[in-house]
């Protein structure tokens, strides 16, 4: 019997632990409350810090508690142009400026936003990687929904009351600098997750992987597998409709006027 392959070890009940020892905290907007729904609340950017395992910097914002005499600190992914000592306004009546957190329904079309809520009150899940942003496309006042363009280019409809931070996420251009050597990849993934180095299946022995073995590195059989294959066999091109290079382009159909 062969050994458990990588995809089986990654499944439920895995032995791996999250690399979160030195992380500074989760990136979340402040909890939605009465002050944000009907007005705004002011906060102060205390510090902008590096969070290991995250490409974007984190901003530590101190808000005054609306009900008790104390301050509450939250960690949020920093927007490009945010600085220490800056006042951040959160709420439906906040001004439109970089770093403020407002409902997407109050923003004009074409506004660049980040840290967008998918559901009202989830404290921001969309467009949070370094340099990422979403764009407000259109509003529908009748259904109280807003259409936004995601960083992938896909369009998405969200509730107009969902909050977002104005601006794009700081740390853009991080991936433009090449890693150049294996040591940098080692430290990068040591802070992120246990996914490096990744050994190819054809470089393994036949006991360790369906693609392993042979006097030279080759798969030795078609790499396509059926959809309902067992977990230890389900590697390669899974339920592929077609394989190989896509040769040629899409045929162009001309109208009668263009043929003339």
From Swiss-Prot:
GO molecular function term, any single one: rRNA binding
Gene3D superfamilies named in the record: 2.30.30.30, Nucleic acid-binding proteins, Ribosomal protein L2, domain 3
Region of interest called Disordered, as start-end residue ranges on this chain: 208-230
SUPFAM superfamilies assigned to the protein according to its UniProt record, in alphabetical order: Nucleic acid-binding proteins, Translation proteins SH3-like domain
Superkingdom of origin: Eukaryota
Record keywords, A-Z: Cytoplasm, Ribonucleoprotein, Ribosomal protein, RNA-binding, rRNA-binding
Disulphide-bridged cysteine pairs: none
UniProt cross-references to Pfam families, sorted A to Z: Ribosomal_L2, Ribosomal_L2_C
Compartment(s): Cytoplasm
Any one GO cellular component localisation term in the record: cytosolic large ribosomal subunit
GO biological process: cytoplasmic translation
Family to which the UniProt record says this protein belongs: Belongs to the universal ribosomal protein uL2 family.
PANTHER family the record matches: LARGE RIBOSOMAL SUBUNIT PROTEIN UL2, RIBOSOMAL PROTEIN L2
Protein name, per record: Large ribosomal subunit protein uL2
Naturally occurring in which organism (per UniProt): Caenorhabditis elegans
